[in-house]
């Protein structure tokens, strides 16, 4: 949607007849956090430790849940983690206790690295204008209320998936 009204364009693009605001939490976030961190670790994420003893490679990208960094993941493993989370979110049929912590309305926005530092240094340096439009890479997960979600058909997993605005513009 191309509208002259400026900043709300992304939200206007997301809103449809089936779009709905989430009035309350689907799952208790405090209870979910610990189990969810275990699940993300099983799917390939390196969790953050409280002793700050781990230093992650520069190329690793953050995994963020509701604004809190849960850990980091190798960019080569990130698509697999995202795909697995989508499958769990859509299927909701596995009886494993860890899978119960994934809400059906979880927003899974994967912002992949555009190019790594070696590729950029091998090519000509980008101008300030080109750099300005790039974003911070990571896997950004949102489970809190007061978000817009809308149902879409996920062709890969054969089910209905609820997506949010950030997720919509970064889906491939």
Describe these PLM feature segments:
Residues 1-172:
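Conduit-forming functional cores of very large proteins
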């Amino acid at each position: 949607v191309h509208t002259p009204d400026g900043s709300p364009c992304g939200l206007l693009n997301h809103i449809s007849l089936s779009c709905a605001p989430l009035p309350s939490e689907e799952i208790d976030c405090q209870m979910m956090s610990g189990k969810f961190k275990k699940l993300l670790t099983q799917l390939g994420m390196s969790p953050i430790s409280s002793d700050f003893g781990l230093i992650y490679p520069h190329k690793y990208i953050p995994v963020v849940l509701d604004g809190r960094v849960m850990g980091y993941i190798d960019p080569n493993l990130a698509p697999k983690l995202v795909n697995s989370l989508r499958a769990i979110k859509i299927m909701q049929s596995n009886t494993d206790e860890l899978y119960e912590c994934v809400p059906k309305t979880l927003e899974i926005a994967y912002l992949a690295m555009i190019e790594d530092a070696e590729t950029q240094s091998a090519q000509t340096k980008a101008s300030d204008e080109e750099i300005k439009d790039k974003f911070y890479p990571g896997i950004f997960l949102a489970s809190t209320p007061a978000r817009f979600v809308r149902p879409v058909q996920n062709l890969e997993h054969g089910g209905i998936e609820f997506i949010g605005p950030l997720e919509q513009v970064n889906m491939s």
